[in-house]
């Protein structure tokens, strides 16, 4: 167990000490006695804004936030310490919403017979872009815009021109400086709660040792690749929060030794969350669900999450489900990260996609139903687990069941920067251990090696013939080892595929053929695992299951499915 966990434990224990470590401030935007004067923040005269409390709170102080919808951007620049963190928490049982949207009233009926309403609109996001979009390309001409409109907390669909409008749409017309809205039920907007997103960030924590707990964040007008919540300080904690319905990413983590615990990242336009340089991130007991609702390009950045240049990040005991893209995506120079005891289900592309990164450990997860989208160019990238030019990985004791493909190796000529340097280095799959997994009932293949390289490295040296080129790799040199896995394919399902479909490619219907020719499997068996009822996600083993299957079962607690040991 890493030493920094003890610091997080101490941080959690501090919460039991009440206000003994510092002052307690109250925020209540609904109170008629609330004020943002310096002498506020008391029970009798609470502060009206969270921002005022964030400005005043110092190490050891506790900010209690009462019920309300807070329309502001909160920036925390002060720092606490390990012994005296700054704490911003919702009051017990309170529903605290921090929103990027403002309410708009005084709607006027627009020209024409349809129930379209208009209001002056002078806000322009991404003014540096010729089309107010990021990325500024034809694919993202609509997707990459930042505007959002909600009626009674339900988002409408955006169109680019007023003549494209229909029920349930809106148009932010920059040239006329008007916002047009058509309710999905043709109602009078002056009788409804109509909100439009005006703020691109909701919370930015620049200080260290800051704990934020129990808040709901929504409706930010954030641009692609930028989180509505930004944790940039060391040892910051986000706990029991929800980030939902952002235009882009729910949150971005960029500080070291941060903790994200029991949070929900759901229905965001591009990503649940992103992380860059978030070394020693602990992401635990969270839900990441149904992100990329706007349809950003999945080959660029979209889906459940994306981690870049992170070292020793841990994703554990969390659910990554129904994301429109990859469930978990490591991309560019990550080192020694861990995914363990997670439930990764129904993501439209890969469950876990590890791309040009080093030393990933994937252990004790349940990975089901991933990869069934028709994403263009996603060859070798729609499996339960994909190692894409990512060496020194260990994949152990996972249930990889019912995906498009089970376990994939994906290879091209790739480079990546390393942490702390911009210099690019070559990177490829080698020294991989895939051991004690149950890989079964995947549709197209249980194992597929997608090697799009010209040197034939995916084949044994003996099958390639003699080569005088010392830089030519062979399968033996890659040191890819499958140890003691359990495989099984049902009727009509593939077993073992090797090579890309547009080049030299071989199918191995049996484990014996796969093992005999490639010589990379040791101790594997091809048997029905004997699940009680996979259709209801009951992955307990029936009485006929053999010992080889039981040895490969995930260790510890995995959320959601029914597993051995009482899950």
Model-inferred region functions:
Residues 7-16:
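Bacterial N-terminal signal peptides
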Residues 230, 237-247:
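Surface-exposed extracellular loop regions of Gram-negative outer-membrane beta-barrel proteins
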Residues 24, 60-62, 67, 73, ...:
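Detector for repetitive beta-architecture
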Residues 18-22:
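Sec/Tat signal peptide C-region and signal peptidase I cleavage site
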Residues 1-4:
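Positively charged n-region of N-terminal signal peptides that target proteins for export
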Residues 201-203, 218-231, 248-255, 266-524, ...:
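Glycine- and acidic/polar-rich repeat regions and solenoidal domains
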Residues 24-233, 428, 482, 493-494, ...:
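Extracellular polysaccharide-degrading/modifying enzymes targeting complex plant/algal/animal polysaccharides
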Residues 55-58, 243, 320:
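Residue-level signal for alpha-helix termini/capping positions
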């Amino acid at each position: 167990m890493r030493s920094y966990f003890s610091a997080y434990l101490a941080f959690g224990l501090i919460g039991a000490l009440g206000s003994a470590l510092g002052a307690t401030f109250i925020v209540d935007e609904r109170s008629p006695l609330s004020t943002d004067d310096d002498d506020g923040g008391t029970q009798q005269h609470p502060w009206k804004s969270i921002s005022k409390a964030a400005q005043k709170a110092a190490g050891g102080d506790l900010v209690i936030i009462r019920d309300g919808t807070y329309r502001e951007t909160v920036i925390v620049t002060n720092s606490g310490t390990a012994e005296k963190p700054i704490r911003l928490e919702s009051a017990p049982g309170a529903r605290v919403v921090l929103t990027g949207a403002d309410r708009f009233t005084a709607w006027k009926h627009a020209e024409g017979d349809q129930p379209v309403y208009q209001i002056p609109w002078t806000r322009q996001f991404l003014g540096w872009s010729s089309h107010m979009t990021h990325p500024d390309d034809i694919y993202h001409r609509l997707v990459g815009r930042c505007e959002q409109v909600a009626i009674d907390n339900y988002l409408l669909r955006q169109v680019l021109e007023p003549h494209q409008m229909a029920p349930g749409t809106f148009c932010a017309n920059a040239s006329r400086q008007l916002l047009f809205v058509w309710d999905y039920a043709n109602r009078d907007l002056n009788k409804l709660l109509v909100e439009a997103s005006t703020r691109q960030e909701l919370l930015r924590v620049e200080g260290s040792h800051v704990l934020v707990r129990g808040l709901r964040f929504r409706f930010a007008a954030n641009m692609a690749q930028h989180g509505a919540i930004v944790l940039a300080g060391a040892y910051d904690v986000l706990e029991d929060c929800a980030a939902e319905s952002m235009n882009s990413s729910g949150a971005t983590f960029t500080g070291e030794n941060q903790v994200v615990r029991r949070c929900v990242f759901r229905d965001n336009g591009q990503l649940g969350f992103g992380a860059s340089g978030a070394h020693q991130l602990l992401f635990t007991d969270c839900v990441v669900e149904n992100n990329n609702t706007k349809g950003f390009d999945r080959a660029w950045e979209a889906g459940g999450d994306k981690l870049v240049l992170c070292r020793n990040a841990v994703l554990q005991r969390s659910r990554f489900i129904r994301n429109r893209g990859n469930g978990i995506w490591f991309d560019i120079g990550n080192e020694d990260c861990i995914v363990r005891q997670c439930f990764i289900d129904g993501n439209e592309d890969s469950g876990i996609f590890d791309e040009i990164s080093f030393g990933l450990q994937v252990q004790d997860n349940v990975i089901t139903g991933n990869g069934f989208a028709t994403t263009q160019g996603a060859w070798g990238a729609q499996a339960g687990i994909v190692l894409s030019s990512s060496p020194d990985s260990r994949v152990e004791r996972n249930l990889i069941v019912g995906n498009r493909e089970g376990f994939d190796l994906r290879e091209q000529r790739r480079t990546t920067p390393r942490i702390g340097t911009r210099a690019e280095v070559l990177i490829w799959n080698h020294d991989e251990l895939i051991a004690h997994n149950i890989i079964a009932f995947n549709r197209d293949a249980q194992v597929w090696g997608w090697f799009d390289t010209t040197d034939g490295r995916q084949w044994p040296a003996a099958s390639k013939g003699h080569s005088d080129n010392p830089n030519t790799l062979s399968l033996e040199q890659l040191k890819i080892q499958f140890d003691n896995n359990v495989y099984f394919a049902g009727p009509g399902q593939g077993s073992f595929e090797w090579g890309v479909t547009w080049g030299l490619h071989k199918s191995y219907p049996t484990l014996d053929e796969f093992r005999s020719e490639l010589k990379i499997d040791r101790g594997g068996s091809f048997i029905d695992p004997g699940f009680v009822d996979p259709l209801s996600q009951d992955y307990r083993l029936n009485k006929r299951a053999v010992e080889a299957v039981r040895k490969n079962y995930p260790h510890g607690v995995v959320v959601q499915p029914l597993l051995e040991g009482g899950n």
